[in-house]
Amino acid sequence: MREFLVLFNHAPTSPDRVRLKDLPGSGRFDLVCRVTTQALLYSHGVRTDTVVHLLLRGPDDPPKTITVTGRRVRRLYPDERTTAIHLRRALEADPDTEPHPGIFVRRADLEDLLGEMKGAKLYYLSEDGRDLEEVEPEPDAVFVLGDHEGPTPEQDRLLRRHADAVISLGPIPYHADQCIVILHRYLDVKRPPEYAHGPSNVM
């Protein structure tokens, strides 16, 4: 199983703060949606071997973690608005529930999640990390990264203590959703998933 854990320290945890007509102005909830779709969708399909954990720590009810499981999720489309509707419904729901097929919400912070992931190969993405090609990460692993503002210093220290390796995608900083696409491409080549049908340029 391939997992992504993405930290959004200012993304809202209250559904009332997610404005569908202004996702960028809703604590950059547009980025949360893009990370979700890029982690789980490929051309004409859903990555059934992938899970994405969205750690939200913004107002008004932090922390909340929304987990979207590719094997179970239904009606996930590339547009941000539809994804935002699903995620906002998760924020409306009681903790420890599945308000939409394949979308779970619970009250968990970074330390809780890292404790649950103990024993898994864990890679932390940071600009000062070792080159991806040098580390050659396992396809079945957890990849942790921050949003455009990055982890807090405390989160950074915690991740470095838990990570099997700190990795970098190169000298140019990318958005979180772009990092996920780059990782997918690298890992898909290393071990093509069951749903792969050979080379394709269709996006």
Curated annotation (Swiss-Prot):
<keyword id="KW-0963">Cytoplasm</keyword>
<dbReference type="GO" id="GO:0005737">
    <property type="term" value="C:cytoplasm"/>
</dbReference>
<comment type="similarity">
    <text>Belongs to the methyltransferase superfamily. TrmY family.</text>
</comment>
<dbReference type="InterPro" id="IPR029026">
    <property type="entry name" value="tRNA_m1G_MTases_N"/>
</dbReference>
<dbReference type="GO" id="GO:0008175">
    <property type="term" value="F:tRNA methyltransferase activity"/>
</dbReference>
<keyword id="KW-0489">Methyltransferase</keyword>
<comment type="function">
    <text>Specifically catalyzes the N1-methylation of pseudouridine at position 54 (Psi54) in tRNAs.</text>
</comment>
<keyword id="KW-0949">S-adenosyl-L-methionine</keyword>
<keyword id="KW-0808">Transferase</keyword>
<dbReference type="GO" id="GO:0030488">
    <property type="term" value="P:tRNA methylation"/>
</dbReference>
<keyword id="KW-0819">tRNA processing</keyword>
<dbReference type="InterPro" id="IPR007158">
    <property type="entry name" value="TrmY"/>
</dbReference>
<dbReference type="Pfam" id="PF04013">
    <property type="entry name" value="Methyltrn_RNA_2"/>
</dbReference>
<dbReference type="GO" id="GO:0008757">
    <property type="term" value="F:S-adenosylmethionine-dependent methyltransferase activity"/>
</dbReference>
<feature type="binding site">
    <location>
        <position position="146"/>
    </location>
    <ligand>
        <name>S-adenosyl-L-methionine</name>
    </ligand>
</feature>
<feature type="binding site">
    <location>
        <position position="179"/>
    </location>
    <ligand>
        <name>S-adenosyl-L-methionine</name>
    </ligand>
</feature>
<dbReference type="InterPro" id="IPR029028">
    <property type="entry name" value="Alpha/beta_knot_MTases"/>
</dbReference>
<feature type="binding site">
    <location>
        <position position="125"/>
    </location>
    <ligand>
        <name>S-adenosyl-L-methionine</name>
    </ligand>
</feature>
<protein>
    <recommendedName>
        <fullName>tRNA (pseudouridine(54)-N(1))-methyltransferase</fullName>
        <ecNumber>2.1.1.257</ecNumber>
    </recommendedName>
</protein>
<comment type="subunit">
    <text>Homodimer.</text>
</comment>
